[in-house]
Amino acid sequence: MDERTLRMFETKFEYTKEKLATLEEAIDEKTKQGVVIKAMYDAKLGDLIYERTKLFYLCQYLNKRVSIVKQYRERGEYISSTMLDAILESMREENINKLAEYKEKVEASKRYLESDDVGFYEKGIIYDQYKEIIYKIHPDLHYYTSPTNMNIFKRAQMAFIANDYVALADLNRLACENNENLTFKEKQLLLKKMEKLIQQKNIKLEWIPIRAPFDKQELVKNEAMLNEEKKRLMNDIEQFEMIKKQLEEIIGQIVLKTDA
């Protein structure tokens, strides 16, 4: 491959990768927002979380593949597609195993919610299953809501610093449901401080339940909101798939030129 052609591929790849990063960030935020609204009573969003995870690992795999090609090229060495596949086989298998684990959690959540023996408020437990899936995608998020010696407000502050919608919703739920045995005055103070932090961070208030847990009337209203959000997210995923194909084509061309 001549230097001019390689530079052309690299420029196209970097541009596409930037578009991909921007879109991934949008999908990530919409996924978190959807979980905040829906996770306390429904598991339908699990499929979208799973798809987002799958795309995340695919992007990671493609980036690694391009990185290896560039390393060999910089050393003036040749690497074939077969060699690349062999080098990345363990990474591919690990990703497949992780995805299978996530998929089972999503399906388990659905089975749980479809059971007639499970009451409306009992289904709030599903939120914890969602957290487990999300924390495996973003392990650092687990710190904010793990049992620690820090009080709930300190954990809320840390969640706000990270713009962590999922942890925020959980901490708010802890306060509203009084899971930490807060007095009424302590609970009022916490929610007031959390609302102030939201305003400081310019986080959209409509996505954050600074109040008691959803009642049935709110759930009906938020069902329509989430359905609209899911449509937008599916459009983003379609765009993500298009960009993924572009990346695959670029990588394929780089590999073919390298083989030649």
Task: Report the location of each language-model feature.
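C-terminal accessory/regulatory regions appended to core domains
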Residues: 1-260
